[in-house]
Structure formats: C-alpha cells, structure tokens
Amino acid sequence: QDPRAGEVMVKIAASGVCHTDEVAQQQMIPVPLPAVLGHEGCGIVEKVGEGVTEFQKGDHVLFSFGYCGHCNSCLAGRPYACENFNAINFGGVMSDGTKRLSKDGQEISSFFGQSSFATYSVVHKNSIIKVDKDLDLDILGPLGCGIQTGAGAVLNRLKPTAGSSLVVFGCGTVGMSAIMAAHLCPCKNIIAVGGNEKSLALAKELGATHTNKRKKCDCIVGEIKKITGGGADYAIDTSGVPDFVKKALACVKFLGTAVVLGVTGELTIQVQEELMGEGKSLIGIVEGDSNPKLFIPQLISYYKEGKFPFDRLIRVFEFDEINEAFEASHSGNAIKALLKMR
C-alpha cells in the first residue's frame, strides 16, 4: 500500500542480514506470521505520505528501529527505551496498528517497522535517516542496527576514558563495531575473543591490541587479568552464549562493568560471589543506547574521516543468495553479509 500520514515509501537498495531476523523466523521473537523480515535496509525515497516534509522523492536514506516518539522515554531523547518498542518493532503492524503488506488478499506482517527484504518498503519517518548522495548507499543499512549496537554500547553508554581496558567476546558485526569504537576513545587494552583466525586478524587491524581464540577460552579470565593488571574495566558479550557472559563478568575488575548485547539463554549467576562481592555491574544495552537520527550521522562522519572503517566488515550477496548469506554469517565467512536488491 501507499504510505499513509507520517510514512515514506522507499525503493530498497540493499539490506544487511542479522541474527535477529533468524530469531524472528524461528519465533524466539513471536512476530506474527506470515511476515517479511529484514531490518538493516537502505534505499531511495519513492513517495512520501501526508505531513512528511523532511524527506522527498530521490533522497538517499537508511532505516533504524521504530519508536513512537511520544512516550516519556522518547520525549526524553531515549527512543531505544521506547515504551512501545516491542509492539512497533515486533508486533507485525505499523505504528498506527495497521498493515501495509499483503499477498493474494492475505495481510502480511512487517518487521522492525521496515521489512527490508523486499523491493519496496513503507517506513515511518521516525525510523529514517537521510544520508549524502556521495556515499555508497548500498553499504549503509547495517549502521541502523548491528553497527550502532556495538559502537553505541561503547560510545553512548560505557564512555571509556583514555587508558581504559575493554574485552569483546565475539568478533561479528556487533563485536567489531565495539572494537572500532573503543579504538576511537582510545582504550589502552582492547582484547578480542573470537571464533576464527581470520576474524581475529581483522579485529587486530581494526584496533584490538590483543586477541584470543575462543576454543582456548577456559584460561581467558586469567590471561585478561594478566594483560590488564587485575581485570578489565569493561567487558562486552555479543555472542549470547551463557558461558561467555559469565566469563565477561569474571574478567572485569573490582567495580567493573560487563555488558550483554546478544540474545542470551538461561543463565545462573551467584550474586554474592560473581557480582555484589566486588561491586561489579552486569547490564543489558538495547540498540547501543542510540538516538539514530543523531548517532548514525556521527558514525558516518567518523567513517568519512577514516576513523571507523565499517565497510571492511561487509560482504555483498545478491538477494537470491539470501540462504548463502546467512550460512556465510554462521560459518564466519562473512562478518556482515549484505543483500543487494538492485
């Protein structure tokens, strides 16, 4: 359907693939089916709905998560904590409670307010960020989710001072983005824990000062304490593997902070022994604590200055290679798989 008030129709240029798409497909996030997935999209504006003045036909744009814009969190500048976040992004409907997609008379659910695995998408203006036309549009979509999640966790929430130490478990898109952000701070010690030598080598090029193979993770806590002189200031788990979350908490020093960014299964923590006894913090961060309309342009500025080379994470696939793209993501043959739609 055409865009309604406050909405924009965009012809999709490309979309990143993300583990969250699979989580929704597998119904770990109960998005109503059938649905069109995809939530790291970018493209060119085709039409604008009533009341939309900030975008026009031909604009280059990328998408981020949806938010209502009128709850207490949104009004306080925290759209990542929108009180209607789950309904807007995972409820299968647009912000007005209706659907824009259908096939043979059957309504189809949307995802993350964008459903970017498609030729066209209708998106609320809240989720759209305009970008300069001199940028390579195709690579920008992942900024709207995975990249801002990792980078934002560091730059928006942790805000490490120069000389701090940070450990990142997982060298996928989120982890690599956190490493690049930590390098910007700059942290003294940036320790990457990853699954294969190729990704660890890239992590080193992007700013990691030390690397550790995940298969050798049993002794990682001791190694980190040796490198950092007693424990890291911060540790981020991007894998969602419960054992790595526990190791992230164990490797930070007294009053240190461990962060969970991945979808994590059941986990048992001994509060006195592992958390309270040393004044540690264990926190979850959603979408990098980001206000996308402000933070994504900041990341693009860093990229243009050569300080945030996120393009090195990307491997491009054609849309009909979508299954291969997900397989490459699983195997580590692609850090950020990107589907080209044009």
Language model features: what each stretch is:
Residues 246-250, 293-342:
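C-terminal hydrophobic helical "lid"/dimerization subdomain
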Residues 262-279, 294-298:
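Rossmann-fold NAD(P)-binding glycine/threonine-rich loop
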